[in-house]
């Protein structure tokens, strides 16, 4: 391929990534668009119940009247009565209606509770992902502390597809121990909320806390969990994650390791992904950066295998493998033009760990192993059975290191519409 043609392709992909980052920042700004002087209104939550509907909560503070809501586009609705709706918009609306039938309940510890968003007390922000922000919250009826992802509904079709994909995957993956569990959902006119189990932190923040490598024994257990989660998604639901990276790998003080954030996951058709979604440049596989035919994406789950390999090199060494890159363009160029990164021989990694990472980072995706082959690798086999006290290691790291976020949680006036 001519250099100029490749540069144009990389520039377009870089522009797409920048646009997605701007959209993500815009969603966060919308979620935090509450000034300290402005009273926070009570969210009105429509609930489905026995085929009918229950009127929203009438709780409101007489001292703090609800301000007029700003006009917003409703999900899947035409802007005028005469605007024809696309089949995709109709499908999005139909999927939302199906999810609406399940909203307004939390199932925690085998118990099902009728609930609404105002039954949750906001304890502060935990972070942000592809689709929105994550808040630490307490369910007032039981005292359970959970994580709640807030995603802004809009008239943007791509954003709405992300929301529905994230919802669809977490709701269906209740039987996988390696995927973060969903307790229930709440849907309002402006937002979608997913209530999930509370995990401790992500692998990216752990790396920052430690300011160095994560031990191989921990990465061994992490690899087993993530490969099995990805294999489950592919085999059970025909889904490719497309955003495997350290910030989407969660750990907790019980030693659990789970995969999260399915906003840009894609459906597989004949085991192939047929749609493009940018994801994160730093972890993107070569075949996604420079496909043979950009108009017809045709990659498979081995793109996620590459992303896992890059993540393992980063976590095992404490450094991102493509160094000194100031732009996405530079990263994408290095991925295509340089040899794949490997685990350094001088850092004392086992032979099977080095071999596993080398297999994941096979540049020719046709020679890169799929999940069934990876699950047979000696590195996976070893850590499937080897006892590793992840819980004690995690607690020790959290106790002896400082959070990379100096602010802890947001100050109360800037929290969203929870009371």
UniProtKB/Swiss-Prot annotation:
Transmembrane segments: none annotated. One of its GO terms (molecular function) is enzyme binding. GO terms for cellular component: cytoplasm; cytosol; nucleus. Signal peptide: none annotated. Activated by phosphorylation by specific MAP kinase kinase kinases such as MAP3K1/MEKK1, MAP3K3/MEKK3, MAP3K11/MLK3 and MAP3K12/DLK. It is an enzyme of class 2 (transferase). The modification Phosphothreonine is found at residue 275. The record marks 44-45, 76-77 as: Cleavage. Residues 120-380 form the Protein kinase domain. PANTHER family: DUAL SPECIFICITY MITOGEN-ACTIVATED PROTEIN KINASE KINASE HEMIPTEROUS, MITOGEN-ACTIVATED PROTEIN KINASE KINASE 5. This is Dual specificity mitogen-activated protein kinase kinase 7. It comes from Homo sapiens (Human). The lineage of its organism: Eukaryota, Metazoa, Chordata, Craniata, Vertebrata.
């Amino acid at each position: 391929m001519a250099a100029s043609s490749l540069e144009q392709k990389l520039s377009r992909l870089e522009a797409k990534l920048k646009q997605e980052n701007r959209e993500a920042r815009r969603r966060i700004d919308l979620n935090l668009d509450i000034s300290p002087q402005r009273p926070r209104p009570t969210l009105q939550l429509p609930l489905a119940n026995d085929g009918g509907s229950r009127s929203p909560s009438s709780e409101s503070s007489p001292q703090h009247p609800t301000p007029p809501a700003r006009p917003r586009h409703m999900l899947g609705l035409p802007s005028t009565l005469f605007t024809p709706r696309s089949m995709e918009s109709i499908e999005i609306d139909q999927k939302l209606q199906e999810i609406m039938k399940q909203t307004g309940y939390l199932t925690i510890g085998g118990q099902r509770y009728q609930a609404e968003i105002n039954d949750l007390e906001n304890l502060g922000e935990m972070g942000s992902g592809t689709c929105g922000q994550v808040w630490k919250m307490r369910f007032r009826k039981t005292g359970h502390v959970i994580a709640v992802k807030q995603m802004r509904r809009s008239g943007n079709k791509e954003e709405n597809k992300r929301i529905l994909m994230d919802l669809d995957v977490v709701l269906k993956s209740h039987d996988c121990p390696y995927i973060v569990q969903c307790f229930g959902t709440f849907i309002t006119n402006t937002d979608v909320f997913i209530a999930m189990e509370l995990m401790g932190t992500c692998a990216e923040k752990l790396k920052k806390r430690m300011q160095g490598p994560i031990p191989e024994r921990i990465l061994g257990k992490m690899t087993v969990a993530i490969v099995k989660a990805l294999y489950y998604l592919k085999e059970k639901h025909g889904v490719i994650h497309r955003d495997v990276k350290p910030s989407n790998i969660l750990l907790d003080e019980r030693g659990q390791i789970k995969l999260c954030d399915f906003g840009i996951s894609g459906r597989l058709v004949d085991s192939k992904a047929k749609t493009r979604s940018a994801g994160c440049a730093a972890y993107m596989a070569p075949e996604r950066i420079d496909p043979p035919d950009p108009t017809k994406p045709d990659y498979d789950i081995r793109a996620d295998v590459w992303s896992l390999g890059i993540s393992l090199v980063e976590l095992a060494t404490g450094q991102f493998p493509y160094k000194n890159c100031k732009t996405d363009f530079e990263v994408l160029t290095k991925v295509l033009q340089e040899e794949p990164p490997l685990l350094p021989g001088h850092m004392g990694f086992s032979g099977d760990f080095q071999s596993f990472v080398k297999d994941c980072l096979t540049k020719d995706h046709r020679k890169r192993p799929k999940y069934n082959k990876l699950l047979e690798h000696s590195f996976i086999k070893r850590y499937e059975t080897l006892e590793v006290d992840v819980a004690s290691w995690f607690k020790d790291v959290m106790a002896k290191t400082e959070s990379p976020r100096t602010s802890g949680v947001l100050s109360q006036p800037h929290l969203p519409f929870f009371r």
